[in-house]
């Protein structure tokens, strides 16, 4: 079985969230198109995402080994285990869908905390000399970033407004993931009509994304 990981970053119920509504439609179409996928869901507003503390690391981005870990208090050991679990869940996925609103030209804080957890030496990156190198180029993977925003963002303003999108894309490349798609739900506006129009416009792009997912075929 292939693994599809669906990460949501919005405290709103799905039927009130444009990003989650479109994200769900994308996930459903992936599952309909490729029956070899098993779905795992991670709600970053409900899951425990540990805050990284210096005592959890042997060196930069490198978690403690078993012997050093056992010297920590039980609560801190649990935090380290959760960080490793989140990282392993991500790297085991063949396709990852992240659904989030744009906040303050970026995204809600839980997504940054999650990214900090999954950037780990020996799991998703390594260092060759002083330069980082991604480890997730061992097989084809795809990440799709679904982002909602109230305004229609013109292409020439994309570098300024879509800082969150570009950050996530850069982090995926850092980890070695080459296939990255965005699905933008722009112009959700202030009225139900504007929101529905933006959702439907984004949904019309789903089929093209699904047809071109890259993952290791059986």
What residues fall within each predicted segment?
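A short, hydrophobic secondary-structure junction motif
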Residues: 26-30, 139-147, 172
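Short histidine/acidic/glycine/proline-rich micro-motifs that form metal-
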Residues: 11-14, 152, 189-190
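Short, well-ordered coil/turn elements that cap or connect secondary structure elements
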Residues: 34-36, 138, 177
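Short coil-to-beta-strand
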Residues: 1-4, 97, 141-143, 176-181
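Helix-loop-strand module that forms the ligand-binding subsite of alpha/beta enzymes
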Residues: 76-166
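Glycine-rich phosphate/pyrophosphate-binding loop and the adjoining helix
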Residues: 28-31, 154-218
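Cofactor-binding loop segments of dinucleotide-utilizing enzymes, especially the Rossmann-like FAD-
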Residues: 9, 148, 185
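N-terminal beta1-alpha1-beta2 submodule of the flavodoxin-like/Rossmannoid cofactor-binding fold
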Residues: 1-100, 105-109, 113, 204-218
């Amino acid at each position: 079985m292939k693994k599809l990981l669906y990460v949501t970053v919005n405290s709103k119920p799905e039927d009130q969230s444009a990003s989650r509504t479109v994200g769900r439609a994308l996930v459903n179409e992936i599952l309909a198109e490729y029956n070899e996928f098993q779905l795992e869901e991670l709600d970053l507003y409900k899951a425990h995402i540990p805050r990284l503390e210096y005592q959890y690391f042997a060196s930069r981005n490198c978690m403690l080994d078993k012997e050093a870990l056992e010297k920590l208090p039980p609560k801190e050991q649990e935090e380290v285990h959760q960080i490793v679990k989140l990282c392993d869940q991500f790297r085991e996925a063949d396709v990852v869908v992240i659904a989030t609103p744009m906040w303050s030209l970026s995204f809600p804080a839980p997504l940054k905390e999650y990214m900090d957890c999954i950037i780990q030496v020996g799991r998703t990156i390594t260092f060759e000399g002083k330069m980082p190198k991604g480890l997730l180029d061992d097989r084809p993977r795809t990440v799709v970033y679904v982002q909602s925003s109230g305004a229609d963002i013109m292409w020439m303003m994309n570098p300024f407004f879509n800082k969150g999108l570009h950050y996530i894309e850069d982090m995926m490349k850092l980890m070695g993931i080459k296939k990255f798609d965005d699905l933008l739900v722009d112009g959700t506006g202030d009225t139900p009509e504007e929101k529905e129009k933006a959702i439907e416009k984004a949904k019309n792009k789903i089929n093209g994304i699904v047809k071109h997912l890259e993952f290791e075929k059986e």
